[in-house]
Design a protein with these regions (language model features):
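Flexible hinge/capping segments at coil-to-helix
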Residues: 71-82, 86-111, 126
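Alpha-helical linker/hinge and terminal dimerization helices associated
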Residues: 1-7
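Ligand-binding cleft/hinge of the Venus flytrap
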Residues: 33, 119-133
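C-terminal effector-binding regulatory domain of bacterial HTH transcription factors
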Residues: 161-166, 170, 180-229
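Short beta-strand-to-loop elements that line the ligand-binding cleft
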Residues: 42-46, 110, 132-142
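Central regulatory/effector-binding core of bacterial HTH transcription factors
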Residues: 11-70, 220-226
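Short beta-strand->loop
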Residues: 74-77, 170-182
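A ligand-binding cleft/hinge motif common to bilobed small-molecule-binding domains
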Residues: 147-172
Length: 229
């Protein structure tokens, strides 16, 4: 995919931030961006909190979820969702959940993400929205750690479809309660309008095309592998 040359981006520094659960997804995209636009100087910060774009000098924050303050400008980079999953070994030791309330009695792997309530999974289904309180012996603020624990059979995780799709296809993970999911759309959030900042416009457009190419949209209900019952 080709992009127009951005002469005004020369020797421009662009500071980006992302939640601690997402660096492995964003880092390859920024590497490709750097190859395409060597005149851009990129700084990539990983944060486990919401950043103050103005006071912290951040040009672009990549956020997951649709809850964005109205004073900020946002453009959706990709549609995504999270699914509930566990390893076959875990499901052999524990009765697979048959309804959402069963999660309260099972070990769950909880991620502390920015301003999200800890241990409360906000899920969607065809019937509407649901909130379930979950607990477990292991928790982290890093998605890759929780992903590995899930593969190790330590509990049920709520993970991005992007992260677990290959594990589910290979049988290393099994999707449970597939009628439930959590929206996890990816947004570029910034304070300067794209028309006034060539470096931000170039970065946002590149990331949007990159995610569309590497992470095509996948409907939540189409991702079901098994109900675990």
């Amino acid at each position: 995919m080709s992009f127009p040359t951005c002469a005004r981006c020369r020797r421009e520094r662009c500071v980006l931030s992302v939640a601690s659960a997402w660096p492995s997804v964003v880092a390859p995209a920024l590497s490709a961006l750097a190859l395409q636009y060597p005149q851009l100087e990129l700084r990539f910060d990983v944060q486990d909190r919401l950043v103050d774009l103005v006071n912290e000098g951040v040009d672009l924050d990549i956020r997951v979820g649709d809850d964005i303050a109205p004073n900020l400008i946002a453009r959706q980079l990709a549609a995504n969702h999270r699914v509930l999953c566990a390893s076959p070994q875990f499901l052999a030791r524990h009765a697979p959940p048959k309804q959402l309330s069963d999660l309260a009695a099972l070990p769950c792997l909880v991620i502390k993400e920015r301003d999200h309530p800890f241990g409360v999974w906000q899920l969607h289904s065809k019937e509407g929205q649901h909130a379930i309180k979950v607990t477990g012996p292991l928790s982290s603020n890093h998605g890759e750690i929780v992903h590995q624990w899930c593969l190790d059979g330590q509990g049920i995780a709520l993970r991005s479809w992007w992260d677990v799709r290959e594990n589910i296809a290979s049988g290393h993970l099994v999707q449970v309660l597939p009628d439930y999911w959590q929206p996890a759309n990816v947004w570029a959030v910034y304070v300067s309008r794209l028309a006034t900042s060539a470096k931000i416009r170039t970065t946002v457009e590149f990331l949007r095309h990159y995610f569309q190419l590497h992470y095509p949209q996948h409907e939540p209900t189409a991702s079901a592998v098994g109900r675990g019952d």
